[in-house]
Amino acid sequence: ESQGGDAPHEGRARTVLVYMIGDVNLWQEQWTNLNRLEAGWNDDIDGNLLVYLDPSPHTTQFPNPVLLEIVPDQTDAIVSRVVKSYPEQNATDKAVMRGVLEDAIRMYPAPSQGLVIASHGSGWWPAFADELVPTDDEHDIPQTRAIAGGDMYGTDVEVNDLAELLPIKYDFILMHACLMGNVETAYALKDKCGMYVASSATLPGASLPFQYITEAMFAQPAADFYHLIQTSCAFYNTLPEDEADLLTLSAVRTDRLDGLATATRALMEKVTADPELFYDKLKDRAYTYEDSPYQDLRQVLALESEGVPELQSDYEAFCKALADAVVLTGDVYQTLPPDMRLHPDDFCGLTCYTPQPDVKMSELNAYFKKTYRWADASGFGLLVGYQGTPETTPVP
């Protein structure tokens, strides 16, 4: 139900929609983020800032989902204007999600559109991975939830489905969720956004400081992600250690990802010729990001190329393509885990999945190769089907 009619709000340079799934265990942080968005907004900004709120039952101000137009406010109250109310609905249902996105575009048309997705995340790693991978006490798969929906429904939206349902190509997509800075997700969304911004690591519960970075999303002629990333890192430097161990952020130009895929494949075709040697080079050396299956893309290919002179030209071409695509990175840390085999200052801005050579992973590896275009384009899919001996099998 629209509040005040359906007449479009025209004349602004950019509309940014924050798709906020609040019915999760981070509901208090999401509520804080709403306050931060109001604090960071001012009426001189040439744009529209909207929030689709899928509310937690704990936030009784909004019993049902709403589309909010953010207005400036420095208090703890949420005073933004409800422009549309929705019946109870599943925020990660594909039809529901597309409908909300279309509402925002129709009601607040602008020549530039941005999208922020705020929820739990695990990159492309599917929420139904436990159906594909037999588990026991000795081999547990990482936590999986794709982009998590509300607790009421217990559903998720997979990255390939997200790419399909997005109604337009956005100027940027910012993922306010854990582990979304992986190349498989960026490549899946390359035709649906010009710039992709995300965290390779888990996103600390302190969230991004929207009170300081909101204006950067509306900079002209394009959003200022240098300011957004640097300000976010500076904010985390002020927090107590127990609130922010590690933050990583990167901005990726999606129009350069095909070039990265081509350069990656040229190298992968050579280093995968001996799969056992490939995995042996990574064993106990490549860092796996927290409770995920992801490793740093550059570190993987650096380890594979190390000490092989005939691979250096291909590796250098890969590094150039990577630097062309990942235009900004930022990190800040308080303490690092003792097993961290990659210093945050060395992270390249994109993680990757290396198909794991375990018979238990065969169905999931096949899903990866069939579903995600990066697998074939980059050559990582060449590893699907290889099954290593137990001593060479990396376990996330």
Short names for language-model regions:
Residues 21-23, 56, 120, 254, ...:
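Generic structural motif
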Residues 23-26, 119-125, 174, 178-182:
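Gly/Ser/Thr-rich loops at beta-strand to alpha-helix junctions
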Residues 54-84, 112, 116-152:
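Surface-exposed loop and adjacent secondary-structure segments within mature catalytic domains
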Residues 106, 130-133, 137-396:
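Terminal, contiguous helix-loop blocks that mediate binding/assembly
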